[in-house]
From Swiss-Prot:
This is Phycobilisome rod-core linker polypeptide cpcG. Keywords: Antenna complex, Chloroplast, Membrane, Photosynthesis, Phycobilisome, Plastid, Thylakoid. InterPro entries: PBS_linker_dom (IPR001297), PBS_linker_sf (IPR038255), Phycobilisome (IPR016470). It holds the Pfam family PBS_linker_poly. It comes from the Eukaryota. One of its GO terms (cellular component) is phycobilisome. It comes from Aglaothamnion neglectum (Red alga).
């Protein structure tokens, strides 16, 4: 029997407030959608925007590209929503984001990249982490893509984006999610970059050349005495 999702309260975020701008300005993000029968060049931009949204700029590697999904999207065999699902469930996304993090971190990253908003609170993070632990990643991804929030904001043909990151009449907007939530948490980053001692021989003390004792230095006589009669010095 699966555990039902926990209830959690919502918090105030910019994306929950409708904008009152008369005309779209620079504060509104560019919308990448297939509703208007895009050309070949526009389809390339849509695919690139999907990769950038899901994998972020620092994960856009050639190994992350799925040419089969791209071909299906170009020939209208799948929707943008299906393309997003294929990227999130791909082995590349799993290796780069899930295998090196815990469920809480993975939930936060998926909500930011799929729903285009930040998590409401720790209760929401815990609720979705339980779904991953009890029902798996695919059920969690289906829950996000089939939610009313995703359908109302992006539908089947629009690439997700960070909603209302920039608001009119403000000096600066919110931090982009790829900078706010990097791929690795500090705990995993510390473990990953911990130096390991691979030298199996004895560890010798290193003394720089300029600090070595010269002729006439009392330290040389002390070493000579230790070499001649160490037992006498220890007993005394």
């Amino acid at each position: 029997m699966s555990i039902p999702i926990l209830n959690y309260s919502l918090s105030t975020q910019n994306q929950r407030v409708n904008g009152f701008e008369g005309l779209p300005g620079d504060e509104l993000p560019k919308i990448y959608t297939t509703d208007n029968l895009p050309t070949s060049i526009e389809m390339d931009e849509i695919i690139w925007a999907a990769y950038r949204q899901i994998f972020s700029e620092h994960q856009m590697l050639s190994s992350c590209m799925d040419r089969f999904l791209e071909s299906q999207l170009r020939f209208n065999q799948i929707k943008v929503k299906d393309f997003i699902k294929g990227l999130v469930l791909s082995s590349a996304f799993r290796n780069l984001n899930y295998d090196c993090n815990n469920n809480y971190r993975f939930v936060e990253m998926c909500i930011q990249r799929v729903l285009g908003r930040d998590i409401y609170n720790e209760r929401e993070k815990l609720a979705f982490a339980i779904i991953i632990a009890s029902q798996g990643i695919e059920t969690f991804v289906d829950f996000l893509l089939n939610s009313d929030e995703y359908i109302e904001n992006f539908g089947d043909n629009t690439v997700p984006y960070q909603r209302r990151r920039i608001i009119a009449q403000r000096s600066k907007g919110e931090i982009p999610f790829n900078l706010k939530t990097p791929r690795l948490d500090y705990n995993f980053l510390y473990k990953k970059n911990m130096p390991q001692l691979l030298w199996s021989g004895p560890v010798r003390q290193f003394r720089p050349q300029e600090q070595k004792p010269k002729a006439g230095d009392p330290a040389l006589f002390l070493n000579m005495v230790l070499d001649v009669s160490p037992s006498y010095l220890i007993s005394s």
